[in-house]
């Protein structure tokens, strides 16, 4: 179970990097800087790989961590919703506050999912 917590911690670190880069992108004028945008998009793949690694390690452990798996699957679904809102924001000509708010709310919900997964893993649920 310790290796799962390490994987979740690394994934959370990638999540923090993505949030910081997103904050910088939010302060940038359109068109967005290509380097920041590409690194921010690459963080999507790092986070998706990290969630997949956590789910894979959970499936190999002997403990029944069904609640943790559900929370990680919710985080994965939120990650896909975040990708869609990010692509829409890139395609729009002007900054749209509604899409920015949706992107931030999904990121916040994903952060709550990561914290909940860590708590449930620590409690071995």
What are these regions (language model features)?
Residues 1-125:
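Membrane-embedded alpha-helical bundles that constitute the cytochrome b-like, heme-associated redox core
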């Amino acid at each position: 179970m310790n290796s799962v917590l390490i994987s979740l911690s690394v994934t959370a670190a990638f999540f923090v990097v993505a949030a910081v880069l997103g904050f910088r992108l939010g302060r940038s004028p359109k068109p967005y800087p290509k380097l920041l945008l590409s690194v921010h998009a690459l963080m999507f793949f790092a986070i998706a790989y990290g969630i997949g690694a956590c789910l894979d390690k959970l499936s190999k452990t002997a403990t029944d961590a069904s609640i943790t798996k559900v929370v990680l699957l919710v985080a994965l679904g939120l990650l896909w919703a975040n990708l869609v809102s990010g692509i829409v924001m890139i395609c729009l000509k002007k900054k749209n506050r509604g899409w920015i708010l949706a992107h931030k709310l999904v990121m916040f919900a994903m952060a709550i999912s990561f914290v909940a997964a860590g708590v449930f893993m620590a409690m071995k649920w």
